[in-house]
Structures are given as structure tokens and as C-alpha cells.
Amino acid sequence: YLRETGLRVVFYPFILMDIQEGNGLADPWTGAANQPSIPWRGRITLSTAPGGHGSPDKGSGAVEQVSAFFGSAKGTDFNPADESVAYSGPNEWSYRRFILHYAHLCAAAGSVDAFCIGSEMRGVTQIRGPNGRYPAVSELCELALEVRSILGADVKIGYAADWSEYFGHHP
């Protein structure tokens, strides 16, 4: 309906982490016994944040954790029908599954003008694997291609960086 009235539509998925007080989840940034409640998505990181003692940053463990976060869902794992989108892929609650589900919903609703594949995930985008590579950036590029295959060439696809990501990573 919005596009029919001449408005341009941007779909901006938002991660809200439902982590409550006293959660017993170790804080990967500080080592505290509990993670902050309802934290900002920019805090998503490795089991121990880069710079922390024992962090897997810069190693193959970082690549494995980033891969697990993104998951292995594919656009073909979804079946849009009527007013729903069924999923038949790997049994995972992953980032790819989240974004690809929304891409299919947008397509089923008549598409959008622009689609963000993520926003303000600096704790993920700054993770390094071996040889100074950034595995989350590679994952986001692959995800953008998959979203493109669902939404088509006319939809603008991007990532909404946090202000601290604009200038690149300077550890």
C-alpha cells in the first residue's frame, strides 16, 4: 500500500536482545557474571571480546563463532505462500535465517525500495580471523547477494553502520 501511494519504503530490521537482569550470562566485554539487560546490538561479539584475555579474535575460533552466528540458512529454505513464509532449513536461530525471512516477507508484500541487511553491529564487524580478514564482512556480503536474489535488482541493499564503523576498524 505505501508504495502504491508514492511513498518509498525502506525495510530496517532491528535486533533487540531480550537479555534480562541477573541473566547469569558472562559479559564477553568485561568478564562480569551477568551481561547488561537489554544491551545494544553493537555489543554482540565473540565468547570473549577482542582484546580480552583468551579472546579467539584473530584466529580460526573467531571465524567459527562468526559462522555460527550467521548460520547456514539459504533463501531456498523458505517457502512463501499466501500470508506466511514457511521455513524448512537447518534447525537454527541464526542471523541469516532472520534476515532472509524478512527478505521473503518483503517480497511477498510487494517488495520495498531499499532493504538493510543489518545495522550497528560493530562488535561483529570488527572481529578478525587469521591474516587480518574480517569474517563478518564476508558473511554480510554473501547475505547481501542472497537478499538480492530474493528482492531483485531494483531494490537498494545496504548495511546501516554505527558512527564508529564509518571510518573503518583501527585497533
Residue positions per predicted region:
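Substrate-binding cleft and catalytic face of glycoside hydrolase catalytic domains
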Residues: 1-132, 155-164
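Distinct, well-ordered alpha-helical segments
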Residues: 165-171
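Active-site neighborhood of glycoside hydrolase catalytic domains
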Residues: 132-158
